[in-house]
Amino acid sequence: TPSLEGAGRQEILNICSKTGCQIQVVPGIYQLVNGEVTISKLRRVELQDLLGRDPIRVNLGEICGYINDKTVLITGGGGSIGSELCRQIARHKPRRLVIFDIYENNAYDIQMELRREHPELTLDVCIGSVRDRGRVDDLLDTYQPDLIFHAAAHKHVPLMEDSPNEAIKNNVFGTYNMAQSAAAHGVKRFVLISTDKAVNPTNIMGASKRLCEMVVQMMDRRSGTEFVAVRFGNVLGSNGSVVPLFERQIACGGPVTVTHPEITRFFMTIPEAVSLVLQAGYYAKGGEIFVLDMGQPVKIDDMARQLIRLSGFEPGVDIPIIYNGLRPGEKLDEGLL
């Protein structure tokens, strides 16, 4: 039942998942009493039920007035976080929403979705790279955005270990280009999407994002634009995250690969991530790094076993689990500060 605290719900889920039975969640008592739903409205266990904590809920209606009638630019707007930002912002009546992405297919998908769901929205989709300063300046000259949410980045830890130059060029110089242009064009507020891997970084991707944070903090001291950063943990269900990988491996009959039996990570859902970004945009005074309280870290091995059981299999029997060792630059545990 949703009325259980996150830890209690997690304990019951752990017990039930070992029975081999299908697990469903009943509506909350308050929903039944208010007539919002009926007892027949059961739902399957969802990704956020695996977090072991209550979901973070934010009344965005109270804080998103700063978006109303503003021109908003989202870099990397076709990605997991960027596209959800587009969806949320579109609901709060911006004057214009500008999506900037190098991947045309992703940009096209979110463009079609927003035109279908928000036909009244003034929407522009622009293809290009944050590494191209001329293109960035041309974009800001054309649209004169009030707010920029900078989500464009390379984020895959192992791939960036093999291509460090690309991580620096795209993440660091891309952020520098966007920040310099934002300051030159009088943008009111600039929000950088960062990561918990920027804390005492041990890999190229984390180090590049820490440099991005330093860039925006430096720019905040030197310009009238308010520059802030938002630091995430791992995002459940995002492109390239561990859960879709596990689901594909389970669907293929295994094995499920985990780097280390004791490795832990902080997790959040995409809506939680976006609510933090939008809150940061509201509360920003300039120079801050915002961090979401994500509760206790989750053991990846436990998550893999739960997903196997929720798929109707027994871990280690029907679906083997293989531990293939920490990858270069990978930590056993992450921090937030």
Regions found by a protein language model. Give the residues of each.
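A solvent-exposed beta-alpha-beta segment
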Residues: T1-N34, I102-Q111, R116, L123-D124, ...
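NAD(P)-cofactor binding segment of oxidoreductase domains
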Residues: G8-V26, R96-Y103, T142, L147, ...
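Flexible, Lys/Arg-rich cytosolic regulatory linkers and terminal tails that connect or flank
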Residues: R9-T71, A183
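Conserved Rossmann-fold NAD(P)-dependent oxidoreductase catalytic core, especially the SDR/UDP-sugar
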Residues: G35, H150, H154-E213, M218-D220
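N-terminal Rossmann NAD(P)H-binding glycine-rich loop of SDR-like oxidoreductase domains
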Residues: T71-H92
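Conserved Rossmann-fold cofactor-binding substructure of NAD(P)-dependent oxidoreductases
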Residues: C126-L147, G329
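A conserved pocket-lining segment of Rossmann-fold NAD(P)-dependent short-chain dehydrogenase/reductase
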Residues: M160, L245-M268, E272-I300, Y323
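Mid/C-terminal beta-alpha module of Rossmann-like enzyme folds, strongest
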Residues: Y283-L337
